[in-house]
Amino acid sequence: MASVGIVTPQSLRLNAPLPLRSGAVLDDCTLVYETYGTLNATRSNAVLVCHALNASHHVAGRYEGQDKSEGWWDNLIGPGKPLDTDRFFVIGVNNPGSCFGSTGPASTDPKTGRPYGADFPVVTVEDWVDAQARLLDALGIEQLAAVIGGSLGGMQAMSWTVRYPQRVRHAIVVASAPNLSAQNIAFNEVARRAIVTDPDFHGGHFYAHGVVPKRGLRVARMVGHITYLSDDVMASKFGRQTLNPELAYSTQDIEFQIESYLRYQGDKFSDYFDANTYLLITRALDYFDPAREFDGDLSRALAGATAKFLVVSFTTDWRFSPERSREIVKALVDNRRDVSYAEIDAPHGHDAFLMTDARYHNVLRAYFARIADEAVAPAGGIKGFAV
């Protein structure tokens, strides 16, 4: 199946300040986004893709002159793929607080003329959804055919259905949860402590010192990556394999293949990801809990949602286990909402939502075909455009 081909990011400077859930306000906010496919004449075939922790607006396609720049969900999105860009107009947007072009900690604070650093305000899933809604306003899209996201992206999809119930017809929530467990919050805290205790962090204002807290970022990524993989995948890929036939009997040297792999992942991550962004996004994960304002009752929290739902989980995902997805399904059933649920037997752990798995992709293909058949008007509209 074909790719969407060469893509070019676009940007939108919001025409008014963005109020945040914390009470702070982003006076000057720019969003970077990409679009794929054609918006039809009735503007009814738009699908918003919400990204997870370390992803971005670059969901599909590749950049000119960069052969290894495929979007993070390129296996899912494109002509003839499960999310078919011959039928849908797909939007990927980088959230505020991230580090891939939208306003974030490395951006210049207009009040000081210096990077925000640690002074960038805390952002939440709800803030991101509000920013995404502003982007849709600028694109002239009143209602989404669907919103889809995996992991943290799935939380944004859920939030869309309660914050803007009339603006989304379908929500596809993949490998997600209605909130973080204590264990997941604990993993995030260990990762954050690794960053803030790095001597190069400088209280979040490391930009002025010309350094990057790479040691902390490496450890944070290593901790996170462990939670993305299943025990079975680790066993099959690495087992107890050593780098060398003979043991070095050292506490400092790398002995096992899994150690080498984790260090490689940490090194790669520290070269491109912003430390302050990591703190912000993991805290947004911690804070997400739509039931909090309803005495912990998720059914009440989702009572205002009118969208139809597809909820997908994976058997070996222990970060956001199938039980957590079934909590979402139960809450929707309690409200007599239209919900489909698929539990995919896949070995990959939490990262399964990013993988090319025939059963998983067939579920999404069938669901998007349903959306297209019931609501998408004939093609022949206008291409995505910058505003």
Swiss-Prot record:
Highest taxon in the source lineage: Bacteria
The protein's assembly and partners: Homodimer.
Enzyme Commission number(s) from the entry: 2.3.1.46
Primary enzyme class: transferase
Protein name, UniProt field: Homoserine O-succinyltransferase
Organism placement in taxonomy: Bacteria, Pseudomonadati, Pseudomonadota, Betaproteobacteria, Burkholderiales
Subcellular location: Cytoplasm
Family recorded in the similarity comment: Belongs to the AB hydrolase superfamily. MetX family.
Binding site for substrate: 221, 351
Function as written in the Swiss-Prot or TrEMBL entry: Transfers a succinyl group from succinyl-CoA to L-homoserine, forming succinyl-L-homoserine.
UniProt xrefs under InterPro entries: AB_hydrolase_1 (IPR000073), AB_hydrolase_fold (IPR029058), HAT_MetX-like (IPR008220)
Keyword list, A-Z: Acyltransferase, Amino-acid biosynthesis, Cytoplasm, Methionine biosynthesis, Transferase
Pfam family, one: Abhydrolase_1
The keyword rRNA processing is annotated on this UniProt entry: no
Pathway it works in: Amino-acid biosynthesis; L-methionine biosynthesis via de novo pathway; O-succinyl-L-homoserine from L-homoserine: step 1/1
Chief subcellular location: cytoplasm
Species per Swiss-Prot/TrEMBL record: Methylibium petroleiphilum (strain ATCC BAA-1232 / LMG 22953 / PM1)
NCBIfam families listed in its UniProt record: homoserO_Ac_trn, PRK00175.1
Keyword field contains Acyltransferase: yes
UniProt-annotated catalytic positions: 151 (nucleophile), 317, 350
